[in-house]
């Protein structure tokens, strides 16, 4: 029986690191996950949570320090939930993420294959092209920032080091406007108040900026004052949008957008392809590493110009359009109608003719294409964090492609899905992690899977 109690302190050797970047050790044989500790350290831990098979705690004192421990660059690092690895050197982060992918593949999928060292960034700061800031209030002062780790407590952040400087500027202007006009902010417990979030999107290649004000209503007071302040202080401002979200939900954006200044999209490039980005568009948040990620995906696809490719979860068509350059024909399948419409526009803007985007459930559309005589040699999948639905994987296996390229943002669901593919007669040739999210525990990977 677990005799450890909340509030007790223990000396613990940290032998590994967990899924969210926490240190992992043992107390009387029970695993303890320690916030703020690193592999190789000996620390004093105070227990915060006691569960049947594991414990959670935080670092009170470091007795023996890791060679990879550094002082955080960010002043909010110990409170903000955005970055969990500010205290780990960048080399240490890349080693952790490489090992994380390897461990997940072996532990969950029983897959033993070549996992390459994670590809990192030369400058792992200011890399995000999208910032989503929550709005709150301390006393009478309106604040903007991020939630604390696993909490709905808002940490006020004036300058986020992983955001593009123009995103920080947008939020600074909006916060000033909120206070000057004394506009109500949303209270998630009561479901009342007007301003919920500020979302800033920045196109790295073109410098265009979109400011999105998420509101619990249909309009805002002092609208002209906001527009004028943003125009004056934000270089490259092309769009100011009200996003209507009146539901009591954790979702940041609602489905309705009202343009109050400029246009409804901004434009950016990935390599030489141009993309229109709308308020609801999914676009990889790290444009520098996205080029590396997509280059690796296309390399793994092994295209010679003769192949038919099916791109599953194709979004706004980014990977499909890159594949179309080297393939005979590409079919992109996506369940979100607006994303398909954006993808079609992007194909048109870039003059890409050998691609077709299909709106529908992937498992159904894959089977339909097969019945119509489409023989795909290569399938590319880029699913959300939950991984591929079982029906989708069955449908992919059912059309018997020679190669599958799996782009993953979650090593655990990647491991699960690769196990299914291996049981169905495929083998995982190699996996390349790419660090899309420096200073966080997230890691993207590309896996090459071939028919045996």
Curated annotation (Swiss-Prot):
User: Which GO BP annotation is one of this protein's?
Assistant: rRNA base methylation
- Tell me the active site: 409 (nucleophile)
Chain sites annotated for binding S-adenosyl-L-methionine: 284, 313, 334, 382
Cystine pairs annotated here are none
Protein EC: 2.1.1.-
The first-level EC class reads: transferase
| Domain TRAM, first and last residues per copy | 3-61
- Where [4Fe-4S] cluster is bound, by residue? 74, 80, 83, 160
* Keywords, alphabetical: 4Fe-4S, Iron, Iron-sulfur, Metal-binding, Methyltransferase, S-adenosyl-L-methionine, Transferase
Q: Which GO terms describe its molecular function?
A: 4 iron, 4 sulfur cluster binding; metal ion binding; rRNA (uridine-C5-)-methyltransferase activity
Family stated for the protein in its record: Belongs to the class I-like SAM-binding methyltransferase superfamily. RNA M5U methyltransferase family.
Name of the molecule in the record: Uncharacterized RNA methyltransferase TTE1812
